[in-house]
Regions:
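Conserved catalytic-core segment of NTP-binding enzymes
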Residues: 112-180
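Generic structural motif recognizing short loop/turn segments at the entrances and edges of beta-strands
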Residues: 1-3, 151-152
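Loop/turn-to-beta-strand initiation segments
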Residues: 33, 102-109, 136
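N-terminal phosphate/diphosphate-binding loop that engages ATP/GTP or pyrophosphate donors
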Residues: 4-100, 118-119
Length: 180
């Protein structure tokens, strides 16, 4: 079985790109066979590539076709969810992921971006995907809130959502904190 990690965020601009660069760099020190997979990408135009995927593929010269790195465009996944076809989304994601397992020793799975009003659905869907892929979860959050309790609350909600779904949360990274 391929090792994996599901990287998810609590909100936009948490520093997911930086964290994914660091994790991939560490992984490549241990194995040359690292893959990247984003179950759902938020590109509106199919001609524009996902910036997180593209960054990792180019920076580390990963041996993957771009088309193999994702399962759905966000708009298509939202349409299917609206039709009550969440199971189809999960099944397709599993199928695409399984196709990568034989090619890589480790797959970094990157969750969706939370950049629109459907983000409440995204947390739940990310948790379902992580659970069904059997991937441990690393949560990335922002620390640039007015009160520490606000940061704690956001992290707690994400943590509870994933653990209540049956996922193993292996850690939390809080970026953009005030050093004071």
């Amino acid at each position: 079985m391929t090792n994996s990690l599901y990287l998810t965020t609590t909100e936009p601009r948490c520093g997911k790109s930086l964290v994914s660069l660091g994790i991939t760099n560490l992984l490549l020190r241990r194995t040359g066979r690292v893959g990247v997979f984003r179950p759902i990408i938020d590109q509106k135009d199919t001609l524009i590539r996902d910036k997180n995927i593209e960054l990792l593929l180019e920076h580390f010269n990963l041996k993957m076709d771009y088309e193999d790195t994702f399962a759905y465009f966000e708009r298509d996944a939202i349409d299917l969810m609206g039709q009550g076809k969440t199971d189809l989304i999960i099944d397709t994601v599993i199928q695409k992921y399984k196709a990568l397992e034989s090619r890589f020793d480790f797959i970094l799975i990157i969750g969706s971006d939370f950049e629109n009003e459907e983000s409440a659905f995204e947390v739940e869907l990310n948790a379902q995907i992580a659970k069904n892929l059997g991937a441990p979860v690393l949560i990335v959050s922002r620390g640039d809130k007015e009160k520490i309790s606000d940061v704690q609350n956001v992290v707690r909600v994400a943590y509870d959502t994933f653990t209540n779904t049956g996922c193993e949360v292996v850690g939390v990274i809080v970026n953009r904190t005030d050093p004071e």
